[in-house]
Design a protein with these regions (language model features):
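Solvent-exposed, conformationally flexible loop/turn segments
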Residues: 90, 218, 319-325, 409-416
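Hydrophobic membrane-insertion alpha-helices, especially the h-region
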Residues: 8-25
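Short, hydrophobic/aromatic beta-strand segments
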Residues: 67-71, 81, 192-196, 338-375, ...
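Intrinsically disordered, low-complexity Pro/Gly/Ser/Thr-rich segments with frequent PxxP/GP/PP motifs
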Residues: 383-427
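Short loop/turn motifs at secondary-structure boundaries
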Residues: 26-302, 307-308
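Terminal connector regions
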Residues: 425-459
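Enriched for extracellular/lumenal, surface-exposed ectodomains of secreted and cell-surface proteins
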Residues: 130-135, 246-248, 405, 437-445
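Asparagine-centered strand-capping/turn motif at beta-strand->loop junctions
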Residues: 331-339
């Protein structure tokens, strides 16, 4: 009887596959999940003297698994974990054990904060290295003995003071709660790290201020956080965050403290003087002076009307009489995502040429945006300044902690700013002179400088 050729081929393939499988089992039999565990020392004395300070565990797993290494004190069966359910890929591993385990407290001990890592107490231990397969939950373990010799176990470094101020942080360079100061007091020498945990779980390191204490010394250390806006970066999104301080001593003991920080109204402020497609970006015109415009430290005088004649947008040089008003007008846009803070005097305010903003009680304020005018004969930078917008264009916010009211131009909004300077000083060697506008972020930067430069000539009054 003759078998069909196809059936013969199929039978041959099946037999070949069976032989291959059998051969694999003979040549390379299935390996256990935990292939081997070795420990280099049976006794350690973790006192940093360089003699038997640590032991080395070597182990191999044949499949991806969760690995734990725990030390069980024989006196009371208390467990001290070195590793707990840590994910490992198949392969060989070497790990050094210096006696430092997961944090714990002994009876009658207290510590401000949480203990992350601490030296294990001296005594007799049974170690257990256990693995659990990631694919089918198969488990294996191996045990051994370890003696730990040493003196009294010190506490990890403590941060006996840890403060975060203010708890609500508005990183928008408006001069109000723009920075967070973190104060930490270490009770002994330790490496100190402070960081913010963002909403993705990432650590954002916070820089230590260089003061009297050196890094790592016991004592007070200060950390300064501004959200990145100082380097022109966008701060983290608004929300609740955690500030963490970790202290670690030379033998690896560590503790941490945490505090909550709320970020709100954050964002890099961005504004500009709006360029005009036709005509002057900065309108300059002249007007006669009236005594009602006079302003002083005690009161702002009458406000001059905003220039609104279409012919005022020309780019021609200005010729004006001594004692008349040089009137300007321009538009500012907040094109950022956060409001910008501004302060007076209001648009329409008239300055005498020798007056400064401070002469009207309007002192420089960190974080405030103002429009300024400067001329070549000005003795200081942008001596004449105005708020960006009239009160009805701005949003007023009162700080409940001090009852101060602050004014903001909302994101995406524009405001027209205008005002005047009474030109009273003719300097023959600087006549005509140029005058121009700028957008000032006080104590931060002048973002738009030398905008709308125009030649101004003074002539004697008739």
């Amino acid at each position: 009887m003759r078998f069909p050729v196809g059936l013969t081929l199929i039978s041959a393939l099946i037999m070949t596959a069976i032989m291959v499988v059998i051969g694999l089992f003979v040549v390379q039999p299935p390996r256990p999940l935990l292939v081997r565990v070795e420990n280099s020392l049976d006794t350690i004395s973790p006192n940093a003297d360089g003699v038997d300070d640590l032991t080395q565990f070597r182990y191999e797993i044949s499949r991806n698994a969760f690995v734990s290494l725990v030390f069980i004190r024989q006196a009371d069966k208390r467990e001290f974990y070195f590793r707990k359910d840590e994910r490992r890929s198949a392969g060989e591993y070497n790990v050094l054990f210096s006696g430092v385990v997961d944090g714990y407290l002994l009876p009658n001990e207290t510590l401000q904060g949480d203990i992350l890592r601490r030296l294990i107490p001296s005594g007799e231990y049974e170690w257990v290295l256990s693995v659990r397969a990631q694919d089918d939950d198969e488990t294996m373990e191996q045990r051994g003995k370890l003696t730990v010799m040493g003196d009294e176990i010190p506490l990890p470094p403590q941060m006996i003071e840890f403060t975060v101020s203010p708890p609500i942080f508005t990183p928008n360079q408006d001069g109000i709660d723009d920075r967070v100061l973190i104060n930490v007091y270490l009770d002994k020498d330790a490496t100190l790290d402070v960081y913010l945990i963002d909403q993705n779980g990432q650590r954002l390191p916070i820089s230590r201020r260089e003061e009297s204490r050196l890094s790592g010394e016991a004592g007070r250390h200060s950390f300064d956080y501004e959200g990145g806006v100082d380097i022109d970066a966008d701060p983290p999104d608004d929300g609740m965050y955690t500030i963490v301080a970790e202290a670690r001593d030379p033998i690896g003991q560590a503790s941490k403290r945490e505090a909550q920080l709320t970020i709100k109204d954050g964002g890099k402020p961005r504004a500009e003087i709006v360029g005009q497609p036709n005509g002057a970006t900065v309108v300059f015109v002249t007007a006669p002076y009236d005594a009602s415009y006079a302003s002083s430290m005690n009161a702002i005088g009458a406000l001059i009307p905003m220039p609104n004649n279409p012919n005022d947008a020309n780019l021609l040089p200005i010729t004006m009489r001594i004692g008349d008003l040089l009137v300007f007008s321009l538009t500012v846009e907040n094109y950022g995502i956060t409001p910008i803070r501004t302060s007076g005097p209001p648009p329409g305010t008239v300055y005498d040429q020798r007056q400064l903003a401070a002469s009207l009680g309007q002192y420089e304020q960190s974080g405030v945006w103002r429009v300024g005018i400067q001329c070549e004969t000005s003795e200081v930078s942008y001596p004449w300044r105005w708020a960006i917008g009239s009160p009805d264009e701005l949003v007023a916010i009162t700080d409940p902690t001090n009852d101060n009211t602050y004014y903001y131009l909302p994101a995406g909004k524009r405001a027209v700013v205008w005002g005047a300077i009474r030109m009273t000083d003719l300097i023959p060697t600087a006549n005509p002179q140029a005058c121009w506008a700028g957008l000032i972020h006080e104590d931060v930067n002048v973002y738009n400088s030398d905008v709308g430069r125009r030649e101004i000539e003074l002539v004697p009054s008739e």
